[in-house]
Amino acid sequence: MKKAFISVGEISGDNYASQLVKALPDFMWVGITGPKMREAGVETVEKLENISVVGLMEALPKYFKIKETFKRSVEILDKGIDLLVVVDFPGFNLKLLKEAKKRGIKTVYFIAPQVWAWGKGRIPKIAQYTDLLIAIWPFEKEIYTDYISDSFRVEYVGHPILDIIKTEETEESFKEKIGIEKDKKIFGLLPGSRESEVKTLLPILLSSAEIIYRKREDLHFVIPSTPNMEENVKQIAGSKKVPLSVITVKDFRHPSYEVMKHSVFLNVASGTATLETAIFGNPFLLVYKVSPVTFFIGKMLVSIDYLGLPNIIAGREIIKELLQKECNPESIARWSLRYLEDPEVYERTKNDLEKVKKALGEKGAIKRSADLIKELSLS
């Protein structure tokens, strides 16, 4: 049985990676894992929850942990690993690809960094250290055209997000299980999965919820949380005077997706969750706030007009983005109420989100990816 190392640095990547692992049962898997990968049987070198960061300033407290995790990962590459699969997380994974390539280990970039948005300088390194890049956007292959060779392949498979999005509850059963009255409408709050995001964004979202609730007492707010952040979320939410539920995988198999599906409106932190929410078709606001230094550096590096994937795909702002100073309780409440109280804006947004979903291609990206990886491992 071939042994594969898989490296994931974010919760969204954990979703995709766990499905990929399940589609490749003939490999023995070890790596940097999230909860779903561990559930799928991947042996853990380090939990991604311990090294996941966003932004330069936010990364500093975890620097030594990340460095130590990298050292241990390289040591494992020396112990008979046949294949390395990495998912996004370029600051860490590009270095790991380089070490694998030195050792003659076959390498796969499954869900590559968004170099079309920022970090185009990484393209030569990605091509140098990667045997197979699995592209999830139709335009990605063109980006790498000048680098494709016998030692670097790029294959487009479609977006795996369509394979992993699943829900099990009706609106009625969802409300019943968390004790929400039938006539109440659900308002989703998704502050992100990283500790730094939750600590920054959740207090803002909850203060906004208090403003919204004063005008809309028919709402019940629901926060889906990862298990490792549940206590933090409940502690932050404890003092707020709005109808509020915090749910995790202990309550539902797919808590975030249930909230996305059954909410009349949502406030969503920038990231993969914005694309997931778009697929369910319910209008939402994109919110984000990082340190001024991180934001300044990001603005210098990014070559696109929007932060949210739905807006990038649409080529215009179909979802309002409230960033940095605009990400405050008053602005979030004002924009949320505008969507909720203007049927024309609400329906237009739903129609725009349906077009975004259609642009993602067909289901089956996970199986197509698994087939490509099998082929590489046998070559």
Curated annotation (Swiss-Prot):
Out of the domains of life, which is the source?
A: Bacteria
The UniProt function text for this chain reads: Condensation of UDP-2,3-diacylglucosamine and 2,3-diacylglucosamine-1-phosphate to form lipid A disaccharide, a precursor of lipid A, a phosphorylated glycolipid that anchors the lipopolysaccharide to the outer membrane of the cell.
* Keyword Glycoprotein found: no
Q: Which reaction does it catalyse?
A: a lipid X + a UDP-2-N,3-O-bis[(3R)-3-hydroxyacyl]-alpha-D-glucosamine = a lipid A disaccharide + UDP + H(+)
Please give the family membership noted in the entry: Belongs to the LpxB family.
Q: In which pathway does it act?
A: Bacterial outer membrane biogenesis; LPS lipid A biosynthesis
Name the residues that span the membrane: none
Q: Write down the HAMAP family for this protein, in alphabetical order.
A: LpxB
Tell me which UniProt keywords the record has, alphabetically.
Glycosyltransferase, Lipid A biosynthesis, Lipid biosynthesis, Lipid metabolism, Transferase
State a single Pfam family of this protein: LpxB
| The name this protein goes by in its record | Lipid-A-disaccharide synthase
Query: What do the Gene Ontology cellular component annotations say?
Result: membrane
The protein's gene is named lpxB
